[in-house]
Amino acid sequence: MRMNKRTLLFVSLVSAAFLGCQIFFGYQDLKSCQDLAEKQRAISEQILASTEQLSVVPWTASAEESESVNQYAVRLGNRLLVLTKGGAHSEVHSKGTSWKLIDQTSTFGGILVSLYGEDGQEVLSKGGSVYLPNQQDALPVLVAEFRRNQEPLVFFGEYKNGKLSNKAGTIYGTSLVFLNTGNEFVPLGIYNSKEECVESLDLPMARAVVFADKENLTTSGSYYMLANEYMQVIVSQESGAIEGINLPFASDREGNKSIVNEIGFDRELAAGSPSEASFPGVQAIDSQRQNVSSVVGGYYPLLRRGTLSDTRKMVSPQYQALNIVSGRELSSPVATGFRVVSFDNKTLVLESGDGGIRKTYTLGEQPYAFDLEIQTTRGQEDLWITSGVPEVEIMSNAFVPAVKYHAVKKNKSDLINVKLPKAKDSLLVRNDASPQWILNSNGYFGVILTPKTPLPTGYASSFIPGNAVPTRLTQLSPKDQAYPASKYPGYTAMLPLPKEAGRYQFMVYAGPLSEPTLKALDRAHTNHKGESPEYVDAIAFRGFFSFITEPFAALLFIIMKFFQFLTGSWGISIILLTIVLKLVLYPLNAWSIRSMRRMQKLSPYIQDIQQKYKREPKRAQMEIMALYKVNKVNPITGCLPLIIQIPFLIAMFDLLKSSFLLRGASFIPGWIDNLTAPDVLFSWETPIWFIGKEFHLLPILLGIVMFAQQKISAIKRSGPVSDQQRQQEAMGTMMALLFTFMFYNFPSGLNIYWLSSMLLGVIQQWATNKILDEKHLQHEVIVNKKR
């Protein structure tokens, strides 16, 4: 019996201890729950206070009914979302305002979600279609959790793989889930806490949200395409930057406004490497969420894309255009794994996975231009925006990349050339300049970045090895290494971003450096003070003698544009330009020819003087000079026409490098298809040293004409040929050969100009010689009276 009492006492004590623990820990749990609830309520109130568009409000079914504390709705601007069981009211009231039913939809468990508005009219999201991210990314959302007899809690959560989570605790109640598109909140769906899944809402405000299905599931490797009549802009979801900018070729097709002509490289790539000439080049999605069909040819790739047939050799995201980079070499992207917030036919909005960066691409009205807005939610130092790497253009057989910026110094604007960095010092950073805009150019095309909001001072440029950003030209005769990647390095231009969080806007021009389009851009961006950004300065090609040739080049182009307007042909305009210059210079040329003719007539007398005074060279020189003087001959005058034409020749050379309108301009189809490239009469497979794989006829014709001119300029000789005359003939022949080799790989436009000039010179030489022969010029020689 005593044993039983002890056992009973022990059991009682254990039970009391257990009950005490239960009460103690229950109290602790209750206190923790109360603390958590208070914390959640405080967070909810803080979020609602900072979110003007979204709020939680009580509602009633009639105006006479007092607002119940357990009936709450979510207000989005002038719309109201109400959760009920059973039927929906045709009208509800909240805070003295009547709300009329717009639409309703049934969800799980008989829950009805009703949409009300003050005017009762339907409304769609302004942001276009909103795409959910791929299944691997978490989407930040705003959640309104409805709990029984309590005001809904509002907190930030994450949506992933159809699931909803809250870092602060478990979600127990039915919840409305909202997506912030930047301009507004749109309903993403309703959360079923029992099944732990989000279901879509069939409501006008929510129909703009598109749930990714299995057939159209986007991945982190997705690309999105914005397009108009001037360009395709291909944006990578992985980097949030531009993978490619493709410019359509000019054609007679209705609606085509492009001024970009197809050239030989484009045709060769389309025929020999169609995979490298495909556009958009990657599997892209348009604003209708349809896959964009790939085509071969028809576009010019402004940016280097690498080798499309080998993903290992495609351009790395760090070198894509309008990327935001940082790091020691300014080559590390600060954000990856972007998601599409909204997407329509003009605007694409992307947000980084961590929500730190939002980028908005908007196609503009101006040709080859679009806008970019970058929104950063937290400050960070040393952020830079990149220009991308332009594709290679061969200008007059040369690779001429350039980085320039436009700035105002001492109330005077100027376009300043940036010294390109080398492989050893691959990064150039300058903090002492304030560019109004910066240009990264390949000669005929360029990317211009213009900040529309204030930025820190400075700019940067970097050298990128050609193997890291291979040009498309490497696919032309790869066995022969006609265009090795290492020979064509890439360059980027960069502008700094402020370290403070905020919105920063840019105007981006990505297209031809053409006078018509850049002038139109200048007019569109001239401010109320009449100040122009002077984008047209970007087409200036500054050679070694630009201070001399620039006025001549401007004059030549004005005359050429006039003749092109009359004839419709740039080739004919070059020939007519040559005729005009010959007419203007005719008096000087005629005087020079007559002077040279007299020099030739004086040659026998000069030889006599040299023979007579061969032991007195000073005396012979004096007699020869006296002979020149009495016959009014200056030995230098024969060179004047050539000297005068040199500035025009160099100006024409520079003009062909700077005038985009001549690029791809055809003169004789099948032979002269591009005035800025050598003519091609025929070609072959195996390259020959210096000649290459193409036969250029124009420089050979030029050499023949120069040789003929030298023969025509020589007078008929009755006596033996002197050593000096033999040397002159040999020199003339060598000059003809030299010009043939020198001009062999020059642009056909330059060869047409020089060939036309030589032909007209031959005609003038022949006519002048004939006239002088008829006048018996040999009797006009006056011999010194004293020898």
Curated annotation (Swiss-Prot):
GO cellular component terms, A-Z: plasma membrane
Pfam family, one: 60KD_IMP
GO molecular-function term, one example from the UniProt record: membrane insertase activity
InterPro entries, per database record: Membr_insert_YidC, YidC/ALB3/OXA1/COX18, YidC/Oxa/ALB_C, YidC_ALB_C, YidC_periplasmic_sf
Biological process terms in GO annotation: protein insertion into membrane; protein transport
Lipid moiety-binding region (S-diacylglycerol cysteine): 21
Keyword vocabulary terms for this entry: Cell inner membrane, Cell membrane, Chaperone, Lipoprotein, Membrane, Palmitate, Protein transport, Signal, Transmembrane, Transmembrane helix, Transport
Membrane topology, as annotated: Multi-pass membrane protein
Lipidation positions, renumbered (N-palmitoyl cysteine): 21
The organism's place on the tree of life at top rank: Bacteria
Intrachain S-S bonds: none
Stretches that traverse the bilayer: 543-563, 565-585, 636-656, 688-708, 735-755
Record-linked PROSITE patterns: PROKAR_LIPOPROTEIN
Location(s) in or outside the cell: Cell inner membrane
Signal peptide: 1-20
Self-association state and partner proteins as the record states: Interacts with the Sec translocase complex via SecD. Specifically interacts with transmembrane segments of nascent integral membrane proteins during membrane integration.
UniProt function note: Required for the insertion and/or proper folding and/or complex formation of integral membrane proteins into the membrane. Involved in integration of membrane proteins that insert both dependently and independently of the Sec translocase complex, as well as at least some lipoproteins. Aids folding of multispanning membrane proteins.
Similarity-based family: Belongs to the OXA1/ALB3/YidC family. Type 1 subfamily.
PANTHER family named among the record's database cross-references: CYTOCHROME C OXIDASE ASSEMBLY PROTEIN COX18, MITOCHONDRIAL, OXA1
Protein name in the entry: Membrane protein insertase YidC
Record gene name: yidC
